[in-house]
């Protein structure tokens, strides 16, 4: 892995193996039984998946030495932001707002 020492790579691979084992220990429930029983099994499975996800974040943050939350993005002041509603803007593949900029931000 780019820019990392071999020892750090081994620790990261160990963390990934631990996380893989955690996810493999919680297979999706079988589709047998009554509707209520299946629903309860899926509900418990989702709760375990949430716990595994939380544990995985903690394991990775511990091994990588940084928090799982992203660093806050620095945004420009609101006064400098504007909405461009022109149809000839060259951004293909994105939706353009059809509203007007009048009254935006005013109560």
UniProtKB/Swiss-Prot annotation:
<feature type="short sequence motif" description="Nuclear export signal and binding to XPO1">
    <location>
        <begin position="73"/>
        <end position="84"/>
    </location>
</feature>
<keyword id="KW-0813">Transport</keyword>
<keyword id="KW-1048">Host nucleus</keyword>
<comment type="function">
    <text>Escorts unspliced or incompletely spliced viral pre-mRNAs (late transcripts) out of the nucleus of infected cells. These pre-mRNAs carry a recognition sequence called Rev responsive element (RRE) located in the env gene, that is not present in fully spliced viral mRNAs (early transcripts). This function is essential since most viral proteins are translated from unspliced or partially spliced pre-mRNAs which cannot exit the nucleus by the pathway used by fully processed cellular mRNAs. Rev itself is translated from a fully spliced mRNA that readily exits the nucleus.</text>
</comment>
<dbReference type="InterPro" id="IPR000625">
    <property type="entry name" value="REV_protein"/>
</dbReference>
<keyword id="KW-0014">AIDS</keyword>
<dbReference type="GO" id="GO:0030430">
    <property type="term" value="C:host cell cytoplasm"/>
</dbReference>
<dbReference type="GO" id="GO:0003700">
    <property type="term" value="F:DNA-binding transcription factor activity"/>
</dbReference>
<dbReference type="GO" id="GO:0044196">
    <property type="term" value="C:host cell nucleolus"/>
</dbReference>
<feature type="modified residue" description="Phosphoserine; by host CK2">
    <location>
        <position position="5"/>
    </location>
</feature>
<comment type="similarity">
    <text>Belongs to the HIV-1 REV protein family.</text>
</comment>
<keyword id="KW-0509">mRNA transport</keyword>
<dbReference type="Pfam" id="PF00424">
    <property type="entry name" value="REV"/>
</dbReference>
<feature type="region of interest" description="Disordered">
    <location>
        <begin position="81"/>
        <end position="107"/>
    </location>
</feature>
<feature type="region of interest" description="Homomultimerization">
    <location>
        <begin position="18"/>
        <end position="26"/>
    </location>
</feature>
<feature type="region of interest" description="Disordered">
    <location>
        <begin position="26"/>
        <end position="48"/>
    </location>
</feature>
<comment type="subunit">
    <text>Homomultimer; when bound to the RRE. Multimeric assembly is essential for activity and may involve XPO1. Binds to human KPNB1, XPO1, TNPO1, RANBP5 and IPO7. Interacts with the viral Integrase. Interacts with human KHDRBS1. Interacts with human NAP1; this interaction decreases Rev multimerization and stimulates its activity. Interacts with human DEAD-box helicases DDX3 and DDX24; these interactions may serve for viral RNA export to the cytoplasm and packaging, respectively.</text>
</comment>
<feature type="compositionally biased region" description="Low complexity">
    <location>
        <begin position="89"/>
        <end position="101"/>
    </location>
</feature>
<feature type="compositionally biased region" description="Basic residues">
    <location>
        <begin position="36"/>
        <end position="48"/>
    </location>
</feature>
<keyword id="KW-0597">Phosphoprotein</keyword>
<keyword id="KW-1035">Host cytoplasm</keyword>
<feature type="modified residue" description="Phosphoserine; by host">
    <location>
        <position position="92"/>
    </location>
</feature>
<dbReference type="GO" id="GO:0016032">
    <property type="term" value="P:viral process"/>
</dbReference>
<feature type="short sequence motif" description="Nuclear localization signal and RNA-binding (RRE)">
    <location>
        <begin position="34"/>
        <end position="50"/>
    </location>
</feature>
<feature type="modified residue" description="Phosphoserine; by host CK2">
    <location>
        <position position="8"/>
    </location>
</feature>
<keyword id="KW-0945">Host-virus interaction</keyword>
<dbReference type="GO" id="GO:0003723">
    <property type="term" value="F:RNA binding"/>
</dbReference>
<dbReference type="GO" id="GO:0051028">
    <property type="term" value="P:mRNA transport"/>
</dbReference>
<protein>
    <recommendedName>
        <fullName>Protein Rev</fullName>
    </recommendedName>
</protein>
<keyword id="KW-0488">Methylation</keyword>
<keyword id="KW-0694">RNA-binding</keyword>
């Amino acid at each position: 892995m780019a820019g990392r020492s071999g020892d750090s790579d081994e620790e990261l691979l160990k963390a990934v193996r631990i996380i893989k084992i955690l996810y493999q220990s919680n297979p999706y429930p079988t589709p047998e039984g009554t509707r209520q029983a299946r629903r309860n099994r899926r509900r418990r499975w989702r709760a375990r998946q949430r716990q595994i996800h939380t544990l995985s974040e903690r394991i990775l943050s511990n091994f990588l030495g940084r928090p799982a939350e992203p660093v806050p993005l620095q945004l420009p002041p609101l006064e400098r932001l504007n909405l461009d509603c022109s149809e000839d803007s060259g951004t293909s593949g994105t939706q353009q707002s059809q509203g007007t900029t009048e009254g935006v931000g005013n109560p």
